[in-house]
């Protein structure tokens, strides 16, 4: 086995997906605690104390207690290199999340055990399922009264179409929470106990002899009944199914009280796959331990360090090894680029990196070379990774600078924030109007906040409301086709499109110009 293969096998790169407020950021912090990266895990809601979640680093995230960008965190655990991508839970930022899911080898799905599967979780699950990567489930908030565990397992199959296999099982919940029956490790994990007293072994018959009082407790007896039922009618653990994404191991716990998280992390590290091969150049398979370096840009973030007004391109290494100063080719332009400055992350904290391998995420200082979706490669053979998903905006606003004397900072801020991909920029076809398009309202609020905070440029947003965006072949375009009901604009690449007032206006246009081809995006 080569040194490269050995290093690649140590990598575990995954994203955490959930509905907002299911506890995704809290479980991330607890994992970082076990990785020795942080000394204490604060709760995200404690905003007044000035103590914020490690992964919520942007000013607006700290202010509102929500994640609106994907954070990257890296640490060592049990001889493995863990790369966590903490994605935005808010639906308006799902495009950032979708792209992030293209850069991971597994996903952790966090579910609020009181609420079960919620809409955003369902949406994100579909993307992960499509990729065919393993999904690990953490049923969170066991310290509160929630739904019956059997119902939660059944819901996975009913709503998501995936088999759930229980790795542990609650002994009570809420104020009556006693612990977890650890099926996988044949032990009981007691709630709110020190490390030395936390685990009680079960004998070969599954009997608990070290705590007679608990063994006789009606809650424990109820747990044993559930486990008997699972053995009779539940799904059987199947590692091959897990790796294909057809079965999800289910763990119960409470991220807030750090209960069940360590057991989950231990199992995850052992079960989750190392970096897998990628399909490149449309139909070729590229092994992760192929010696030639290659990767793709899945995210661009401006102002991670507000003092330097910089831009970082996040690259998932798909194959080979990165070395500081490596010369690569940017596939889109064919131009050579030397990668001298690369960083690894602990949210907004950075460490200069001299080498990294397939599975790792590195940040490249970007002076404008990179775009989201770019492929880079070091060998002579061109390598192009598949396109990343792109959403068609649904809400549009005209944007102007409040202070006309600050045009320079207005343009710089707008161009940098647009390059991050959460919001899209259009220009009037025959005017100088700037029009922004987004999937949801929160993106405009974040844009406005960041323009003021990071670029000292206050903006005015004038709503155009919900519009249907449709691109048109330039050869078929006649500017006279434009009207107040179908506004003609051009995208960042200069391609023309109409912003229709509603679906009726689009149908009317198609009836009037039956030969004109409209597409939802280029």
From Swiss-Prot:
MF-aspect GO terms: GTP binding; GTPase activity; translation release factor activity, codon nonspecific; translation release factor activity, codon specific
Recorded family membership: Belongs to the TRAFAC class translation factor GTPase superfamily. Classic translation factor GTPase family. PrfC subfamily.
Localization: Cytoplasm
Keyword Cytoplasm: yes
Binding positions for GTP per the UniProt entry: 18-25, 86-90, 140-143
InterPro entries tied to this protein: EF-G-like_DII, EFG_III/V, G_TR_CS, P-loop_NTPase, PrfC, RF3_C, RF3_dom_3_sf, RF3_GTP-bd
Major localisation: cytoplasm
NCBIfam families, sorted: prfC, PRK00741.1, small_GTP
BP terms from Gene Ontology: regulation of translational termination
Signal sequence, renumbered to the chain: none
GO cellular component: cytosol
PROSITE patterns: G_TR_1 (PS00301), G_TR_2 (PS51722)
Residue ranges of every copy of the tr-type G domain listed in the record: 9-276
PANTHER family documented for this protein: PEPTIDE CHAIN RELEASE FACTOR RF3
Function: Increases the formation of ribosomal termination complexes and stimulates activities of RF-1 and RF-2. It binds guanine nucleotides and has strong preference for UGA stop codons. It may interact directly with the ribosome. The stimulation of RF-1 and RF-2 is significantly reduced by GTP and GDP, but not by GMP.
Pfam families for the chain: EF-G_D2 (PF22042), GTP_EFTU (PF00009), RF3_C (PF16658)
Assigned keywords, A-Z: Cytoplasm, GTP-binding, Nucleotide-binding, Protein biosynthesis
Protein name: Peptide chain release factor 3
